[in-house]
Structure formats: C-alpha cells, structure tokens
Amino acid sequence: RYTGDSEDEIGVLGKSMNTLSEKLKETIGELKTANNELQKDIEEKIRIDEARKEFIANVSHELKTPIALIQGYAEGLTEGMAEDPESRDYYCEVIQDEAGKMNKMVKQLLTLTALEFGNDKPVMEQFDLVTLINGVLSSAKILLQQKGAQVFFDASEPVMVWADEFKIEEVVTNYLNNAMNHLDGEKRIEIRLEKNDKEVKVTVFNTGQNIPEEDLGKLWTKFYKVDKARTRAYGGSGIGLSIVKAIMDSHNKACGVQNVKDGMEFWFTLDCSV
C-alpha cells in the first residue's frame, strides 16, 4: 500500500493503486459472500431433494398396505367371494376402514407440511387451558370408555395461557390418543399441570411399557414407529407426534418425552397469559 503524500506521477500512481486495491478487496469480499450464499442454496436444494425422496419413499410404504387390502377385498366382492350378507358387510367394513386410514394420513401430512414450511403460523390468543383439556377429554369420552381407561385430571382453577388455541387442542388430542393407544397395566391416564410465573408445563402420563432410551428422540420423526405391528393395529401413521413437535416449534416452546415407573410421560410448555 502506498503511504506517501507526493503529488508527482509516482504519488498519483500510488494513490490509484490504493484505490484499485480497495475496490479489488471489496469485490473479492462480495464474491466470497455470493459464493457462500450459493453454497448455502446448493446445500438447501440438496437437503430439500433428500427430504422429498425420503417423503415419497415413506408415503409409498405407508400407502402400500391399505391399497393392497382395499384392492384385495374389492376384487373379492367383484368375484363373488363374499357369498352371504355378513361376509359382504365385513369386506365393505375393511375397505372403508383402510380408506379412512389413508384419508387421515393425507390430512395429517398436509397439516405437517404446512407447519414445517411456515405456511400455517400460530394465531396467538389468550384462553383457559383447563377448559380446553376438559373439552378434549369430553370429546374422547366414548373412546376412553372403550379402552377401559381411568382418566385423572383434577385441575379446577382456570390456567390462562397465550398460544394458538386450535393448535394446542391438536397437541393435547395427539398426546391423549397416543396415551390411549399405548395403554397397558392399570390403564391409567393422568394429565398434570405445573405452573410458575412465566410458564405452565402440561404432562400426559399413561401406564404401559417403557420405550428404549435410544428410541425416545426418534419419536418426533415422521413415520417413525417403535412397534410397527401395534401401530398398524390401531391405525396409527407415525405422524401425530411430528405434528406436536412442529406446533411447539412454531410457538418457540418445548416438548418432550421420558420413561417413568410403570409408563410414559409426554409433556409440553406454554407461556402463561399476563
């Protein structure tokens, strides 16, 4: 770098070289920034492509069984294999049940995709969490009775929170469904609220088998199933907990799971309303 103050030709040349050097440095910096951005774009494209391939593979795998069953039973009806009304009714029930499972999975996938891509942002409002939970329990009353579940939720005072009421209802519903589907032993479900000045923690406990510690973190991954046979039996898709995680991420709040004595606990936190 030229540091002189001469006004002759050497001085002018030196100052010109300084200016050129600064411009070159600035241009190189811009090129590095552009290159970094391009690299990020390439990595993001690769990530999206891999996610797309994984998504297609998973969806294809999940749809394979219900489509095969629907096709098989439909062909059975067409070929007259169900000769009596009782058999025909059974064939139709299987077809309707499998179609319902596919419909449920597609709806869950649409919900999850919208959440993951930020197209379904939470609409924040103040509401009573206790009223919401009681509403979910009331809606699930018949299912709980069919499972022979004992449900304990003794919160009586309102607990006001700040969140998207519709989405939190979906979180509670998914946790409750998960508890019902993995209920065992005493068949007890407990919902507990722990509140401090800033947050409330909601915990849903169910008696049943523990999950291997190495599998706990995978539960939030879409299509992941610890017990595939059992999940298939109750019509699960392995998407419900992924939706929970996406909803809590959109609220910038935490959720988790842990093994406890005689069962499992799933939890999430919300901001208390001022």
Residue ranges, per PLM feature:
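A short, conserved loop immediately preceding a beta-strand within the C-terminal catalytic
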Residues: G4, E93, E157-W162, F166, ...
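Short alpha-helical segment of the dimerization/phosphotransfer core of two-component systems
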Residues: G29, D97-M105
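Conserved micro-motifs of the catalytic ATP-binding
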Residues: F117-P122, M160-A163
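Short helix-loop "hinge" at the ATP-lid/N-box region of the Bergerat-fold HATPase_c
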Residues: A179-M180
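Conserved catalytic submotifs in the C-terminal HATPase_c
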Residues: T3-D5, V123-D128, Q145, Q150-V159
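Membrane-proximal HAMP signal-relay module
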Residues: R1-I56, A74-T78, E93, K222, ...
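Short conserved segment of the HATPase_c
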Residues: I211-K225
